[in-house]
């Protein structure tokens, strides 16, 4: 949306038919409240342009039209309920200021949308995402809207019940190399990391169902290898099979993987779209946990002045759609994310949210054993450690790499921050060698 275009809209004498209101003048249970960062050139009236944006995302267009009557407006118009300038100039805008920055709140009638994630995105992001400086920061959902969603089928407690692990973070391994053939190579690595002590093995997000590594071949080989490892170690391991594909293949992949024995699914939820994640999570025939991978997320959240905030795109929304585990960036490895944002995303996964179960945060991206105490210090025990190369690159092999991470988790849960000291005191050679990588 070009802010320089002349936009006109009709104002009615009835306040309830206009695209603005006091926060106290609306029923919060009838509206989804979107909070935005917006910036406008100095000469523009922020109160008028924000109302134009509200109309653009509800009843209006760039000119008044006959059908947009007061009655239509009363039922369906979005309303600006807050425009707050930062800093809050009261006397005058300084001459040197060219762009003025605002926090804006717009209330959208949720019945315009229904409990549909595709229409939610079309409404709260939609056309206005083309404004040069506009970023969606948060969405406040009314309880009645959220009643239409089931959320995670397992959640934190359910995944822990499946694995029988209650008192520590879980350990996940991504098979490396990311893309490989034949499937036997991955199955061999899966056996090694499973017997070394990982709780979850996931396909890389880049490997789903290519001709050279079909789900029909891969899943039986992986599950046989994992079953052997579980028998040896006396613990259970989940295998998250990547079912990502276009519709309807993604749903067919999920059905096929489960028929072949898969006990967990992985989907690249932003590549497929939130409705696909939701369809998998709410399918009664799918009785396994679902892991949601973050790829494509950077296109939404990385810009400080446009897009969608990380706490929404990585936090609240995948949880609402039904993810049991959400993969997202950790600030301690190769992924760029501020530590406070990474913590805030985890809060969106775990804090109370009506009837929606908490889900596991899974910080990822270049994680090494030395980072585990930081992860535990910032997130506690209810998260999943995501380790890929940090396990497979261990000089004594993947099983030793997995043991090194388990040792690091044990140390962190005992309050150790100096892993070398802990490893030396307990003669843990796997951890000592991992700390040298």
Swiss-Prot record:
<dbReference type="InterPro" id="IPR033966">
    <property type="entry name" value="RuBisCO"/>
</dbReference>
<feature type="binding site">
    <location>
        <position position="205"/>
    </location>
    <ligand>
        <name>Mg(2+)</name>
    </ligand>
</feature>
<comment type="subunit">
    <text>Homodimer.</text>
</comment>
<dbReference type="InterPro" id="IPR036376">
    <property type="entry name" value="RuBisCO_lsu_C_sf"/>
</dbReference>
<dbReference type="InterPro" id="IPR000685">
    <property type="entry name" value="RuBisCO_lsu_C"/>
</dbReference>
<dbReference type="GO" id="GO:0015977">
    <property type="term" value="P:carbon fixation"/>
</dbReference>
<dbReference type="Pfam" id="PF02788">
    <property type="entry name" value="RuBisCO_large_N"/>
</dbReference>
<feature type="active site" description="Proton acceptor">
    <location>
        <position position="293"/>
    </location>
</feature>
<comment type="function">
    <text>May be involved in sulfur metabolism and oxidative stress response. Does not show RuBisCO activity.</text>
</comment>
<feature type="active site" description="Proton acceptor">
    <location>
        <position position="176"/>
    </location>
</feature>
<protein>
    <recommendedName>
        <fullName>Ribulose bisphosphate carboxylase-like protein</fullName>
    </recommendedName>
</protein>
<comment type="similarity">
    <text>Belongs to the RuBisCO large chain family. Type IV subfamily.</text>
</comment>
<feature type="modified residue" description="N6-carboxylysine">
    <location>
        <position position="202"/>
    </location>
</feature>
<keyword id="KW-0460">Magnesium</keyword>
<dbReference type="GO" id="GO:0016984">
    <property type="term" value="F:ribulose-bisphosphate carboxylase activity"/>
</dbReference>
<dbReference type="GO" id="GO:0000287">
    <property type="term" value="F:magnesium ion binding"/>
</dbReference>
<keyword id="KW-0479">Metal-binding</keyword>
<dbReference type="InterPro" id="IPR036422">
    <property type="entry name" value="RuBisCO_lsu_N_sf"/>
</dbReference>
<dbReference type="Pfam" id="PF00016">
    <property type="entry name" value="RuBisCO_large"/>
</dbReference>
<feature type="binding site">
    <location>
        <position position="204"/>
    </location>
    <ligand>
        <name>Mg(2+)</name>
    </ligand>
</feature>
<dbReference type="InterPro" id="IPR017443">
    <property type="entry name" value="RuBisCO_lsu_fd_N"/>
</dbReference>
<feature type="binding site" description="via carbamate group">
    <location>
        <position position="202"/>
    </location>
    <ligand>
        <name>Mg(2+)</name>
    </ligand>
</feature>
